[in-house]
Design a protein with these regions (language model features):
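His/Asp/Glu-rich metal-coordinating catalytic cores
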Residues: 2-12, 18-23, 27, 33-151
Length: 151
């Protein structure tokens, strides 16, 4: 079952890593550089190179013990877990995190945007067994205008 890969708080049990943790962790996987996802004080940060650059500008060069850059589409094997980033289309460097273990595929995404623009890498649809997504504006009360008239 795909949900057994993740615990509460987006904790990947098998590798003791947290996705977008709100408190400092020994191993953090960061989806993008906005302050509600990227925070300082982690032991190690796995993120796209652009997200790491944003974090260093925002929080300082030494805002984490170490940085592990991972490009889009490049699988990283850690024990029996594979982590791969795919563009989320939200901001420069924003990533969806594909976590694979035991034949199961879980995608965790912070903010994302499906329509392409020139400020970020375009969103890519990722096949998965379970999708965990942010829903800041997911309630029906939020009605956004079409992007062509919004800007």
């Amino acid at each position: 079952m795909a949900s057994q890969i993740l615990d509460r708080d987006l904790h990947i049990r098998a590798i003791d890593a947290f996705i977008d943790p709100s408190v400092p962790r020994e191993r953090a996987i960061i989806t993008h550089g906005h302050a509600d996802h990227a925070r300082s004080g982690h032991g190690a940060v796995l993120a796209t190179p652009d997200t790491i650059a944003i974090m260093k500008v925002r929080y300082g060069e030494d805002c984490a013990g170490r940085f592990e850059p991972l490009d889009f589409g490049v699988p990283l094997q850690i024990d029996d877990v594979t982590i791969t980033f795919f563009p989320a289309g939200h901001v420069l460097g924003s990533a969806q995190v594909l976590v694979e273990q035991g034949g199961q595929r879980v995608v965790v995404t912070g903010d994302y945007k499906r329509l392409p623009d020139r400020t970020s890498q375009p969103y890519e649809l990722v096949e998965c067994d379970l999708l965990v997504t942010e829903a800041t504006f997911g309630l029906p009360v939020f009605q956004h205008p079409h992007p062509s008239i919004e800007i």
